[in-house]
A protein has these predicted regions:
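N-terminal alpha/beta PP-like core and its mobile active-site loop of ThDP/TPP-dependent enzymes
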Residues: 1-288
Length: 288
């Protein structure tokens, strides 16, 4: 059955269907339709930040913690520019974040509209700007484009880094035709698959078999990819198989817990890390 609803309804419905339960945003004239649509979705908590950088940092932290895809929304002009620092950090750390950036109505591109960032007629080019701090950046040109561009953006973000969709206000308000829906305002088949997405887990047993041949204690240094892929259970399985102790890099310090009396967790590596890590590596504190 064919139905029609607004582009913003499609966006929040799709996000809810893949398990996203928070949207971090600063409201504004050219993003208010999306924010209002999120407010009326019981599955989504729309968090109102005081500054766009704060909203971007919240989305980044949400993703780093393993809660799911971090989503941030901001209006056009200066509001969108305030996202750049936060998205730059997400890009540097390869953190999955989806940024939904409002734009003035496309019909006014290059005609002196307030906060025009279309790149037309000498205006600031948001596409060029956000392409520098993202792994994927597209401007939604027609309402029907959202059906393909939104899953593409989410897939690109999940591969590691921020993805940006530029949303002109008239496109946000326009109606989009969709097929049979799953109750979340999005095509059932596509979202059902996306909702089950999870990075493939590796088998720890071949690694364990190799390391059992070594002499002495075994220490594992867990990197930030463990946190990004939520591979905490696999890390613990490997640690238990080896009887090893675990240290972490700073961006993965939550994956193994705090150092305790059982000695299973050594702490964080680096010059600002824990003494136990350096001592386990046979070096001086701050040297590992």
């Amino acid at each position: 059955m064919l139905g029609r609803h607004r582009v913003v309804d499609h966006i929040v419905g799709h996000l809810a269907a893949i398990g996203t339960d928070h949207l971090f945003a600063v409201d504004g004239a050219n993003i208010e339709d999306l924010y209002d649509a999120a407010h009326f979705r019981p599955e989504l908590t729309a968090v109102l930040a005081k500054h766009e950088f704060s909203a971007a940092a919240m989305a980044d932290g949400y993703s780093r913690s393993g809660a799911g895809l971090g989503v941030v929304a901001a209006t056009s002009g200066g509001g969108s520019l305030n996202l750049v620092a936060g998205l730059g950090e997400s890009l540097a750390s390869r953190v999955p974040v989806l940024a939904l950036v409002g734009q003035p109505a496309a019909a006014l591109d290059g005609r002196g509209s307030f906060q025009d960032t279309s790149g037309a007629n000498g205006s600031l080019d948001a596409g060029a700007l956000f392409s520098a701090v993202s792994v994927f950046c597209r401007r939604v040109q027609t309402p029907d484009d959202i059906v393909s561009l939104l899953p593409q953006a989410i897939s690109a973000a999940r591969a590691g880094g921020p993805a940006v969709l530029l949303l002109p206000k008239d496109i946000q308000q326009a109606r989009v035709g969709v097929g049979e829906r799953n109750g979340h305002g999005a095509p059932g088949g596509r979202v059902a698959i996306a909702a089950q997405w999870r990075p493939p887990a590796g088998d720890p047993h071949p690694i364990a078999a190799q390391l059992r041949r070594v002499t002495g204690e075994i220490a594992i240094i867990a990197g930030e990819q463990v946190a990004r892929d939520d591979a905490r259970a696999e890390l613990e399985e490997l640690r238990a198989l080896l009887g090893a102790r675990v240290a972490t890099v700073p961006d993965a310090k939550d994956v193994a817990g705090a150092p305790g009396p059982d000695g299973r967790t050594l702490g964080v590596t680096g010059v600002m890390g824990h003494r136990n890590v350096a001592e386990a590596g046979g070096g001086r504190p701050g040297g590992l």
